[in-house]
Amino acid sequence: VKLGESKQRQAVGAFVHPKTGRIYYALYPDQVVYEYDFENKTTTKIATHPRVKETLRMVVHPTGKYAYLLRQYNERGNGYISRMDYNSTTDQFSTPYIVAGSASGSGYRDGVGSRAQLNGPTQGVFVKNPEYAGEEDEYDFYFCDERNHCIRILTPTGRVVTFAGRGNDSSDPGFANGALRS
């Protein structure tokens, strides 16, 4: 299977669409997103992430309606989560767009959309929330905010809240609240 067109090819994120069975993956450093169709054995370039030279992690929604791309690492130190929407009529994903955090900086702050600050979102999972029963989207997205040392939630409305841990907006080791009591 040919991975892509660039000379330096590293797959940095991938997922299998729950409805079509196709695999989608992003390559470093150009951040092109490809689709591989197991039936036809074809590779197709479907989108280009708006930022390059970033390590992305990809997680598809359980319904396949969209996928999140988590910006885990880059040389500029920004922190965000972008999203690609799936169109079942055209059978294609949209160009990724940022839904939480910012491409121009990082930090620690709960909030909605670009008002939230993230610093190294890496791994995540969708969790069905019974409070959303009957809503269009019934899932929260729990993710690790690595350099803020916490677990956070991205709601379907784009709100980021801290679930566990406390961000200290620092790469210093130790506890945000000071040393442990002896």
Ranges and model annotations:
Residues A14, M58, G124-V125:
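Hydrophobic core register within WD40 beta-propeller blades
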Residues F38, R83-D91:
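Short loop/turn segments immediately following beta-strands, especially the blade-tip
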Residues Q31-Y34, G79-S82, H149-R152, R159:
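A short loop-to-beta-strand structural motif that recurs across blades of beta-propeller domains
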Residues V1-V12, N40-E54, D91-T122, R159-S182:
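Gly/Pro-rich loop segments of beta-rich domains
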Residues H17, I23-P29, H61, A67-G77, ...:
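Conserved beta-strand positions in repeat-built beta-propeller and related beta-rich domains
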Residues T20-G21, T42, G64-Y66, T122, ...:
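Structural signal for glycine-centered tight turns and loop->strand junctions in beta-sheet-rich domains
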